[in-house]
Amino acid sequence: MTINTSFFSLQGSLETDKEELFSNIKINIKYNKWTTIIGQSGTGKSTLLKIIANLNIANTFLNNISADTNKNYSFSWMAQNDLLLPWSNILNNVMLGQKLRREKLDVNRALNLLEKVGLLNVAYQLPSTLSGGMRQRVALARTLMENNDIILMDEPFSSLDSITKSKIQELTWKLFKNKTVVMVTHDPLEAVLLSNELFYITNKQLKPIKLPESKPIRKITSSNLLHSHEYILNLLKNSYIPS
């Protein structure tokens, strides 16, 4: 599906039966760009993704946030857990969406994607035989297999060690380049490395953060990147409210 407009908007308020979570927020999310929302745990990052995806949130929420994404747009969701079916081999996990929809399986496309993520040689193995980083690459291939309009990422790299995380971040960015991505994270460095647009949650609002002029994926040795990382870290520290 071709997306003709340049952005979609997310605006409104959200409250639980106990407190207000967001108050009159407004954010424009650009198509074909990587947008990141950063914030402390419990600030509603994942809830925003659910609203964007037109998912029903718990009835304990009073929600008047509207996302003006067309209802016909399709979404992929990549979570911090790989969510692979343990009894199904890697190839079948990549084709899971087609299986559930009872569509004709595109085995060649699935194998091609496994080759892109460097896992063609384990296509017929079970997930239990793979490392955490390899499993997340399978999840990446499965996300690409769906070829949806908008990719929503809920802290997808948070369970990985530093070296594995760096490698998969770079691979993910290369494969998702020029796609519409909305990611939530609590990692300032990750946000600066990958994002075209960046917002942080503070005082029930979403505020934009200026990023270095260089384009992602940015070099970790860049002085501008390190300065931005320190700046965002301080923002998060100042907005932190102990539970």
Q: Predicted regions span which residues?
A:
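Helix-to-loop junction immediately C-terminal to a conserved catalytic motif
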Residues: 53
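Conserved beta-strand-loop-alpha-helix hinge in the C-terminal portion
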Residues: 203-234
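ABC-type ATPase nucleotide-binding domains, specifically the catalytic core motifs of the NBD
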Residues: 57, 88, 92-107, 116
